Regions:
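Non-heme Fe(II) oxygenase catalytic core, chiefly the N-lobe of the double-stranded beta-helix
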Residues: 1-246, 251-280
């Protein structure tokens, strides 16, 4: 286990996830603190900060210490901070944003390396987010299946993401009823993390349409097995939100799933995604 001098790191599960103490997003952080937070992210795949009181501009400044914020495709950001996407579910809505296991926007040629979600308003119960370790998911496969997967390419599509899972008000604001442009990209089913060198599964029911060179009928049996395998309980952690909580996860090796179990209540989150590279 890595020794930290400037922050406190407390794992929340055996598979992944750790709460970080000693970090205030509203302040200008020392380089040493930023370096340790980055190490904690690489070690634990998703990290959590509590009791943050940062403004949108302070949240953006914090995010820029770890990468380049980018706009979320097809949805508008805050007027005063376009790189921050409001993730909102209102009392009358039934669907939540991204309500399925996924790694963010893999239908982009260069998907984001990480995402930050800051809780502004949370329901009295429910609305947790689950995360799954894709290093462990890959390493738990048999040698034979790992050899089969190495070299396979998945085709990701924004059409597969199913826009009906996102809140209708946000979509109306984004395009005034216009049909969103379908985005598509090809990525390896097994990617190598550019910083750790470890291999991770990189496919999801949310975005992967089929395997390149295979028909959909041929692809689905293998993909469905992987989608179930990727989120086995022993690969996961679950985070309970409170106002001022921040989650920062590594999309290159972790999946997430926002639980939609708080109907009748309002939930408001501010999300930032950080630019990534082309998976290899």
């Amino acid at each position: 286990m890595r020794n930290y001098r400037h922050i406190e790191v407390k794992p929340i599960a055996g598979a992944l996830g750790a709460e970080i103490a000693g970090v205030d997003m509203a302040r200008d952080l020392d380089d040493e603190v930023v370096a340790e937070v980055r190490h904690a992210l690489l070690d634990h795949l998703v990290i959590f900060l509590r009791n943050q009181k940062a403004t949108p501009q302070q949240q953006l400044a914090f995010a820029r210490r770890f990468g380049q914020p980018i706009e979320y495709p097809q949805l508008k950001g805050l007027p005063e901070a376009p790189m921050i996407t409001p993730v909102v579910k209102l009392e009358h809505e039934r669907h939540n944003f991204g309500g399925i296991w996924n790694s963010d926007t893999t239908y982009l040629v260069e998907p984001p390396m990480g995402s930050m979600l800051l809780a502004r308003e949370v329901p009295p119960y429910g609305g947790d987010t689950m995360f799954a370790n894709q290093y462990l998911a890959y390493e738990a496969l048999s040698d034979g299946l790992r050899k089969t997967l190495d070299g396979l390419v998945g085709i990701s599509s924004s059409a597969k993401a199913d826009v009906t899972r996102t809140r209708e008000d946000a979509l109306k604001q984004a395009g005034a009823g216009a049909t969103p442009k379908t985005l598509q990209a090809e990525h390896p089913i097994v990617r190598t993390h550019p910083e750790t060198g470890r291999k991770a599964l990189y496919t999801s029911d949310a975005h992967t349409a089929c395997i390149k060179g295979w028909t959909e009928a041929e692809s689905l049996p293998l993909l469905r097995f992987l989608w179930q395998h990727q989120v086995r309980p022993e690969f996961t952690c679950r985070f309970r939100w409170a106002t001022g909580s921040l989650a920062f996860w590594d999309n290159r090796c972790a999946m997430h799933n926002p639980i939609n179990d708080y109907h009748g209540f309002r939930r408001v989150m501010h999300r930032i995604t950080l630019a990534g590279d082309k998976p290899r």
